[in-house]
């Protein structure tokens, strides 16, 4: 079957248009990716699911807590497949666990963020994605 140039162009444009929602879904444009904010609190709920895992955490006011971080936050992680490669699993956290998370907050100021990593009690970092910086040897 021989396609003429205009028909091929239309098919290609339709294909790109259909792919646009997938690119939009995987965009980090809503997050302030240039900001790393530390959140210290307790896990309310840990959701190990696809397409994104979530840690719902509550940050209470305290002497070593940034007042801007007080509240209940939804930390969005990666897929279970990618997070699993970084050392996460379905029982990594449970409600009540103390957690220190470093994340990129939502630009609109609402209580959500893109998880960068969590700091484990032994000082190691557990990254949510393939976002581990070059040279970081933490496990």
PLM regions and their residue ranges:
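Short boundary/loop segments of OB/S1/cold-shock single-stranded nucleic-acid-binding domains
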Residues: 23-37
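Conserved hydrophobic positions within beta-strands
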Residues: 41-43, 98
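OB-fold/S1-family single-stranded nucleic acid-binding modules
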Residues: 106-130
């Amino acid at each position: 079957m021989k396609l003429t140039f205009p028909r091929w162009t239309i098919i290609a444009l339709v294909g790109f248009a259909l792919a646009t929602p997938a690119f939009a879904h995987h965009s980090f444009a809503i997050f302030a990716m240039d900001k790393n904010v530390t959140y210290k609190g307790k896990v309310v709920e840990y959701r190990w699911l696809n397409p994104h895992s979530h840690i719902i955490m509550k940050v209470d006011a305290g002497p070593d807590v940034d007042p801007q971080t007080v509240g209940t936050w939804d930390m969005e992680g990666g897929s279970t497949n990618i997070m699993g490669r970084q050392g996460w699993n379905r029982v990594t956290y449970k409600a009540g666990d103390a957690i220190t998370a470093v994340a990129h907050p939502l630009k609109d100021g609402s209580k959500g963020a893109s998880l960068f990593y969590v700091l484990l009690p032994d000082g190691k970092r557990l990254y949510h994605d393939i976002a581990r910086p070059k040279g970081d040897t933490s496990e």
